[in-house]
Amino acid sequence: MGVIDMVLFWVLLVNALLIVDASSRNMPFAYQNEMQRHCSSTKYTSLCVQNLREFRHGSLDGLDFVSFLVNKTISDSNLLIPPLSSSMGSSKLVSLEDSTYTLPSPSVSDSCERLMKMSTRRLRQAMEALNGSSRKRHTKHDVQTWLSAAMTFQQACKDSILDSGGSSSASAISHISQKMDHLSRLVSNSLTLVDTIMKNPKPKTKSTALPRWVTAGERRLLVGRARAHVVVAKDGSGDYRTVMEAVTAAHGNGKDLTVIVGDDSATGGTSVPDTATMTVTGDGFIARDIGIKNIAGPRGHQAIALSITSDQSVLYRCSISGYQDTLYAAALRQFYRECDIYGTIDFIFGNAAAVFQSCNIFLRRPHGVKAYNVILANGRTDQRQNTGFALHSCRIRTDSDLSPVKHKYSSYLGRPWRKYSRAIVMESYIDDAIAEGGWAGWLDSGDEVLKTLYFGEFKNYGPKARISKRVTWEGFHSIGFEEANYFSVVKRRNGEDVTNGFKYKFKIKIQI
């Protein structure tokens, strides 16, 4: 760099600092005070202050601060990944500085672009909910859910690039990862402000049979009884003499008869998300009495049966069957009632706010001598995300292939996929196939994660439900009634379950 260039550089730097200092001095004291107060509670305080210094509306409303931060995240997301031209020979991911890095393959680029569009969609939902009259139509839980999902999709984009490994340059991977981390920090700060500023709605005293967002037609679909099409009578007066004859003749009317089947797996070179037999993205998805299988088998490694990124989704009396990574409960609010879920390693994974109520959880025989089973692998990356998994009134048991040899393999309730992983098991039956410690660590994640995770149990029963034998991690909790109620779908009165048949509320602080 020449002398003139050096002098010019320092002149520009000093001017920039003077402008920043002047902008701070020109801010009203009340605004500066509010900005500092709110930002002091965030994880990335300096970034929060830096962003809010750009806010020129002079509002002291904390929600306007949040709205500005969310809008900033949207703007930076759009700068990071513009629409990719399908005619390009190689896909490009554009940085915030407009320099380009070639991604390893079009499939990785397409996946990342899709995830970032999903992230931006949820950011826009949160933005709309924070603006003016919309604030009355949406709750704090809604905004937390959409911001949490936006961060989850950003992390998934980063993961897809990191998993591409040696096919991309180290500099490209590092550069793009840093940009994703920048976006996640912006969302983290927004989540913190939402958590500290917004108020929860007052609980309604009237109990509702189904979530408030389920329509009248959907209620009838879920709780209604089907009209009889055939009659079974031993004396021959009906359509069939035995139940088995009627079942055999049926063309599909239940989770074992109407089944969607796939066999993609990671061993065939397919990316893990793309192995899914069925992928659901539309909000308000409802499934009843249907089966979804991935039959790649235990040698197929990761092979998803069902992947869901649908907000306010409900699955009732469904069967979800696979081995490793069976159910990808990726993001947003999900509820599973009376479902059968089969698998081996991390077979319920993702970062949704998902509750599994009165479900059968079947452990299968894993492949390999040193193989083991893990049910829950939650991917919560920020302590302000309102995500996590809860098993409530479930039965954890072995499938027929594992039962004869279940003591040859270790099986666990869950393990921490991410730093702030959260999982609860309550009022559930725990088979003796589960290890006494109950929970497992994540490979080489270290001791720090054992402090930041949140695993809890409440009033479980069965041969391996003894809390006294559980892991002694700082992040493991034997929770009481109040904490259990916090994670329950159905709230109780005076310790009594107020459920009546298929009735539930879709509102917990993992916030369903």
UniProtKB/Swiss-Prot annotation:
One of its GO terms (biological process) is cell wall modification. InterPro entries: Invertase/methylesterase_inhib, Pectin_lyas_fold, Pectin_lyase_fold/virulence, Pectinesterase_Asp_AS, Pectinesterase_cat, Pectinesterase_inhib_dom. Glycans are attached at N71, N131. It catalyses: [(1->4)-alpha-D-galacturonosyl methyl ester](n) + n H2O = [(1->4)-alpha-D-galacturonosyl](n) + n methanol + n H(+). It is found in: Secreted, Cell wall. Pfam families: Pectinesterase (PF01095), PMEI (PF04043). The keyword Hydrolase applies. Disulfide bonds join C339-C359. Residues 229-496 are annotated as: Pectinesterase 54. It comes from the Eukaryota. This is Probable pectinesterase/pectinesterase inhibitor 54. It comes from Arabidopsis thaliana (Mouse-ear cress).
